Structures are given as structure tokens and as C-alpha cells.
């Protein structure tokens, strides 16, 4: 199916892809994004592992309804989670750039 040169080239591409994947995974782990809700009144910052790093609440909200504040914190976290997922997907897609993958092949992420 593959000649020696073709198989060697395929193995080289696989090794390069593995190295790039490891690098991208490190970059993802170090990423931080901030999600917002309530027009920026609540901000939640998470890292690439979806661990919460910071929660910022505008002081004006501390006088309001507790349930509303809880909803805003949850919405800000969900916004941050969506943003980090999109950033991770974009980073991981860069791993396959330049690789000659079969048509229709999808990366497992």
C-alpha cells in the first residue's frame, strides 16, 4: 500500500504531529479566559483545565438579590467555559494544518 518512502514520510508526519500536539496541550493548560455576564458586572476567569481562577463582582451587585447574583456568576462561568472550549478547538485545529490527512478525516477533539 505504501512504498518505503511513503511510509517513512507518513511516520515523520505522525511524529511531527505528536510533538506539536504536546506543545499545544501545554499552551492550552496555560491559557486563561474571562467570561462575563450582566454587561460585565460579573466576570469569571478560568484556565485551560476549566478550573476557576478568579471571580469579580461589581460592588453594586452586592446590594441586590442573592438569586440574581448567583445566576450572573453561573452565566459568567458558562461564558468562560464556552470561550475556553472555542480557544482549545482553534488551537487543536492548528495541529493538523499542513498535514496531508485523508479526505473526511476528523481529529479526535
Curated annotation (Swiss-Prot):
Q: Which family does it belong to?
A: Belongs to the YbaB/EbfC family.
Which PANTHER family does the protein's record reference?
NUCLEOID-ASSOCIATED PROTEIN YBAB
Give the source lineage, highest ranks first. Bacteria, Pseudomonadati, Pseudomonadota, Gammaproteobacteria, Enterobacterales
GO cellular component assignments? bacterial nucleoid; cytosol
> Major place of localization?
cytoplasm
Oligomer and partners: Homodimer.
InterPro entries xref list: YbaB-like_sf (IPR036894), YbaB/EbfC (IPR004401)
Its localization reads: Cytoplasm, Nucleoid
Name the UniProt record assigns to this protein: Nucleoid-associated protein ETA_24730
Is DNA-binding among this UniProt entry's keywords?
yes
Q: Which UniProt keywords apply?
A: Cytoplasm, DNA-binding
Question: What is the annotated role of this protein in its UniProt record?
Answer: Binds to DNA and alters its conformation. May be involved in regulation of gene expression, nucleoid organization and DNA protection.
Gene Ontology molecular function: any one:
DNA binding
